[in-house]
Amino acid sequence: MAAAAEQQQQQQQQGFRPLDEASLVAYIKATPALAARLGGSLDALTIKEVGDGNLNFVYIVLSDAGSVVIKQALPYIRCVGDSWPMTRERAYFEASALQKHRGLCPDHVPEVYHFDRAMSLIGMRYIEPPHIILRKGLIAGVEYPLLAEHMADYMAKTLFFTSLLYNSTTDHKKGVAQYCDNVEMCRLTEQVVFSDPYMLAKYNRCTSPFLDNDAAAVREDAELKLEIAELKSMFIERAQALLHGDLHTGSIMVTPDSTQVIDPEFAFYGPMGYDIGAFLGNLILAYFSQDGHADQANDRKAYKKWILKTIEDSWNLFHKKFVELWNKHKDGNGEAYLPPIYNSSELLCLAQKKYMTSLFHDSLGFGSAKMIRRIVGIAHVEDFESIEDASKRASCERRALNCAKAILKGRRQFESIGQVIVHVQSFDRD
């Protein structure tokens, strides 16, 4: 208790205080950028806490004339408590990444209205209904016809324009330097994605007792450990582009014709395949969860086909858009492939093919790692958790886990996303 009180006193001295609904109103009134967005009278605001995440408080603030979302980072992991401290500086990196990515892809990133570093507080656009979290839409069996197009656009632009394919090494190093201080969030990822699932760890869990042997098999799989070590090293060492850092289906809000990417508090310069893999891997998890949500009225078979098509389209469209950007800017400031060296279309094409093949295999590896950790690690996904029958849930999870292990180990053998889809389908049976 004394330590907690001392920590609270230090935070107040630094200008930080956690806001509740009452103090949030006072804060808004004292902050012109937020007050202007809400307009009119600020004495009749509607405030709703909506944070269902693991780390932060999130409030929707509505007035007769406008709306904002307020997000405040806490100095600990919310889903665990103050026994697991966590830097509040993640709010700075989230605000910075939102602003940078919105500049590159304004159609799919919400606007930041206000950032208060001392308070670890972001005021941003309220992504209004009928937008919902993509994960919830996937659980409900809703099709999003533009999802693949939109996410391919987002990933191609945010990754290409923050890489050495577009930037000079000087500018790239400046970006890396800015985000390297987000080390605590990166270390959290290192722990929960690349370490804990492969050993006995305090916060690991699985659908017990059904998956106890499956979790043990992960911890005892030497080949899997060798592959995950390679991915962990790449995650830590390879500053390829400015990543979102947590691009799962809970970080995307959608309607049938709109896609908005939120929550980049894990942003850092890392391997592009980590973002791509997070998105594709979470779609594969959604695919394997569908049997647990099927009923007599809807067997979900048609929806499962739509998910597979979305996975395939997402990669293929990303590949197309990314290479198009590369070709468009091949004579620009990018220093990875200098025009005097790659001085023929044939040579550039070969370089692009090698680059994209490597990126494809990276994406498969990271996507598989993200799948595994959601089944035998600390933080699971609602896709599976909302399946009430534990035996049925475990059956869905086991298929996903076995699929992920196989893809991770054999990722370099795949030559197309179509081959991956066939492979995924081969695990979709008891």
Curated annotation (Swiss-Prot):
Sorted alphabetically, the keyword list is: Amino-acid biosynthesis, ATP-binding, Kinase, Methionine biosynthesis, Nucleotide-binding, Transferase
Query: Organism source for this protein?
Result: Oryza sativa subsp. japonica
| One function term, GO molecular function aspect | ATP binding
Q: What induces it?
A: By sulfur starvation.
GO BP of this protein? L-methionine salvage from methylthioadenosine
The record's similarity note reads: Belongs to the methylthioribose kinase family.
NCBIfam families according to UniProt:
MTRK
As its record notes, the protein acts as a catalyst of: 5-(methylsulfanyl)-D-ribose + ATP = 5-(methylsulfanyl)-alpha-D-ribose 1-phosphate + ADP + H(+)
**What's the EC number here?**
2.7.1.100
Pfam family for this entry, one: APH
* Job of this protein: Catalyzes the phosphorylation of methylthioribose into methylthioribose-1-phosphate.
Q: What is this protein called?
A: Methylthioribose kinase 1
Annotated substrate binding sites: 56, 246, 373
Subunit structure, per the record? Homodimer.
> Pathway of this protein?
Amino-acid biosynthesis; L-methionine biosynthesis via salvage pathway; S-methyl-5-thio-alpha-D-ribose 1-phosphate from S-methyl-5'-thioadenosine (hydrolase route): step 2/2
Q: Which residues bind ATP?
A: 52-56, 71, 125-127, 263-265
